[in-house]
Structure formats: structure tokens, C-alpha cells
Curated annotation (Swiss-Prot):
InterPro entries per UniProt: aa-tRNA-synth_II, aa-tRNA-synth_II/BPL/LPL, Phe-tRNA-synth_IIc_asu, Phe-tRNA_ligase_II_N, Phe_tRNA_ligase_alpha1_bac, Phenylalanyl-tRNA_Synthase, tRNA-bd_arm
Residue positions binding Mg(2+): E259
Subcellular location as annotated: Cytoplasm
Species name: Latilactobacillus sakei subsp. sakei (strain 23K) (Lactobacillus sakei subsp. sakei)
Official protein name in the record: Phenylalanine--tRNA ligase alpha subunit
Amino acid sequence: MSLKEQLEHLQQKSLQDIQKVVDLDALNQIRVEVLGKKGPITEVLRGMRDLSNEERPKVGAFANEIKSDLAQAIEARKAELEAKKEAAQLAHETIDVTLPGQPVKKGTPHVLTQVIDDLEDLFIGMGYQVVAGFEVEDEKHNFEMLNMPADHPARDMQDTFYITKDTLMRTHMSPNEARDLESHDFANGPIKMISPGRVYRRDTDDATHSHQFYQMEGQVIDKNITMADLKGTLEYTIHHIFGEDRDLRFRPSYFPFTEPSVEVDISCFRCNGEGCSVCKQTGWIEVLGAGMTHPNVLKAGGVDPEVYGGFAFGLGIDRFAMLKYGVDDIRNFYLNDVRFLNQFTQEV
């Protein structure tokens, strides 16, 4: 039998074997046995050394053609077997689309987000704009424009997270008020803005202090603004958050960016003003600070204090949430304990 006849015989036998296999492993074994370096085709081709120079290239070309045909046959059979395997798997894993699906669990806003959203909705309803600002601030807007000179204790490295000599993590939300004063055109109307967000202090974390917490500050700048406007705004806000039955008390205080300044207390939730351990026997709980915008702050923002005046206020979102919901440790807001957070679920 000539080499060509041997190759034709191997081709026919291999094609029959390829069609007989029923799984991919057996097909791969045929591929190795037939087309591998130790396969029968290679063995037959070793006899080419006995051929004449004229016959050798013809037989070699014929052998390569057979190898190509067998490789194509193997790939075609592989595709058939893979299709059958996939069809069998799909038939086995048939899904009844008429079955009821499992309900998707809804998320819910974090309790601090709920308080922020509530306050934003309240002030937007009163015509205020919400300003976000920058968490990394410069000394000019965080201190200088707010009537806090270089020797002010709040600018000490022990109280503030400095990033560079002149940049820092904002210690309050007041820089946004300073930037608003700088850029505002009173031809478009007065300033009425609130600014909620994260602030940073060099505090040791404990039940009532945190190195990072949420504040909301606001300001109104216009002609003929009085302390009565501030008082009415804060009374409306506190009654909205804590209930109409809360009494308010305004105490004189000091803040560098307001004059006069006040701190606002509400009657104690537990004792209703009678005195207990929660209010330290005073009957009152401090909730925020406020005051009339200091003339130096107006001047720093390019606003004439002889023409315009205003008020500003600042409150702790975390503190509001603690008082409203009776939370005794500020750290609970940041531990992501689902058992704690599930107490404040809200439909969205």
C-alpha cells in the first residue's frame, strides 16, 4: 500500500471515529491521537524518506490537506457536542417564569440623612438655597473672613486638621457663608442659604464627641433684618423637629462671627423643664448657636454693613438626631450596626 493510500485510509477511519464520539473528552483524545506528533499520520510520513524527489512534495502537500480536513472535522464535531450539552443543560434547568419572584428588599436612608433631608425640605420651603461647599478649605474662608484672626485659638494645630500650612479640613460650615457673601449680587435679591455637611475637629471620640460629624449652618443677609427674624426662624425650625410642645430659651453668648450672639436651649424631653440628670438639673438642653452677622464678616465679604445686615445660625445634625431619637452615644451613627439602624427605617 502506497503512502498516499495509507493516508487516505487513516483519513476515512479518523472521520468515522470523530462522528462516533459522544463527549468532548473523547473528541479531544482523538485530536491528540490523530494529529499529535506521535500520531499515525506522522508515523506514515516517516516513509517519505524513501520517496523520490518528485513524489515527496506531492505526498507532503496531500498529508497537510488531510490534517487540515481532520482538524476542521474535529472543530465541527466539537461545536455539535457543545450545542447538545448546552441544550441538555437548559432543558434540565428550565425556569417557570409564571412562578412569583422574591421581592427586592428596599434600602432606607441613614438616620442622619433623614434629619438632613427633613431640614433641607423645611428651609427650601422658606425660600432658602442649599449650598454644599468644600470639605478641604483655606484659612481665609474658614477663619479670616469669619472674624477669626491668626491668634484665634480655633486656628491652633491642636484643634484643626491641617493638610498644608494654609489648607485644612473645614472645622464648620461657615466657610460657605463667607464664599456666598463674596460672590453674591444683591441685585438678584437677598442671601438665604443653608449648608449641611461634614466637618472635622481634633476631638477624641467618645459618647458625645467625634473627630468627624455633621453640621448645618445658615444665613440670611438683606436690608432691615432683625433679631426678631432670627428668633422666628429658629422657633419654627425647632418646633418642626422636636414638636410644638418644646419651650425655647435664648441665652447671650459669644461667637466671633456674630454680634450679638445667642445660644438656644429647649425644654428637657424627660422632665419637661423640672430638672433631671439628662438636663443636669437645669430643665434646659442646648441645641444650637446663632446671632446677628458681625459687621467685620460683612466687610470681609465686600458687603456694606451700613446698608445690609443679617443673621446666621449653626446646629449639629448628629446632636439633633441624638436628642430627637434618644440616642446616648454619637458613635452609634457610624458603626453601621444594622440592629441600631433598623430602628430608623423610612419608606423611600
